[in-house]
Amino acid sequence: MSRYRGPRFKKIRRLGALPGLTSKRPRAGSDLRNQSRSGKKSQYRIRLEEKQKLRFHYGLTERQLLKYVRIAGKAKGSTGQVLLQLLEMRLDNTLFRLGMALTIPQARQLVNHGHILVNGRIVDIPSYRCKPRDIITVKDEQNSRTLVQNLLDSSAPEELPKHLTLHTFQYEGLVNQIIDRKCVGLKINELLVVEYYSRQT
């Protein structure tokens, strides 16, 4: 299944706020109206919608998300929390959380087009897994820095999650540590996502 490229407002009206997909927010009460029209949700639909929320927020294909679920299932600790850590530590999401892009698809374009360096080397793979002490910088070329500066100027000022530090004037971000669960930038019940996939096998 390919990455979603359709109307974004349609998705947030059904699933709620997806800051990684779009900065738009659903109108107050739209979730309640949708639920009243469709009646009581089944447990399957609740799990499916949480899975879809995760997939659309991080801009993943179904196959990519399933791969992350399997990796998380083999790791030590809570599968749901490990899954969120894996997704949050992706390079495209890290750029988004630093404020260097307004959405994750926008961050992915910056990476794909070679504007971003990690530890002094160009990394053009959006799924690159950032690690503590990684230094993320914008390529030292005018078009790259102008592009990112415009995005930084356009992004609403938000408190950075504790695992990241941004040095705006150097166009540099630092990964301090693996992200804590409470700093994840999406309202999600990750256990329902794990349950969804466990019932598919």
Swiss-Prot record:
Function field: One of the primary rRNA binding proteins, it binds directly to 16S rRNA where it nucleates assembly of the body of the 30S subunit. With S5 and S12 plays an important role in translational accuracy.
PANTHER family: 30S 40S RIBOSOMAL PROTEIN, SMALL RIBOSOMAL SUBUNIT PROTEIN US4M
Disordered as annotated region, ranges: 20-44
InterPro entries for this protein: Ribosomal_uS4 (IPR022801), Ribosomal_uS4_bac-type (IPR005709), Ribosomal_uS4_CS (IPR018079), Ribosomal_uS4_N (IPR001912), S4_RNA-bd (IPR002942), S4_RNA-bd_sf (IPR036986)
Subunit structure of this chain's protein: Part of the 30S ribosomal subunit. Contacts protein S5. The interaction surface between S4 and S5 is involved in control of translational fidelity.
Family: Belongs to the universal ribosomal protein uS4 family.
A molecular function (GO) term: structural constituent of ribosome
Ranges where the S4 RNA-binding domain occurs: 89-152
Native source organism of the sequence: Aethionema grandiflorum
Sorted UniProt keywords: Chloroplast, Plastid, Ribonucleoprotein, Ribosomal protein, RNA-binding, rRNA-binding
Entry's localization field: Plastid, Chloroplast
Protein's name according to its UniProt entry: Small ribosomal subunit protein uS4c
GO cellular component: chloroplast; small ribosomal subunit
Pfam families attached to this UniProt entry: Ribosomal_S4, S4
GO biological process: ribosomal small subunit biogenesis; translation
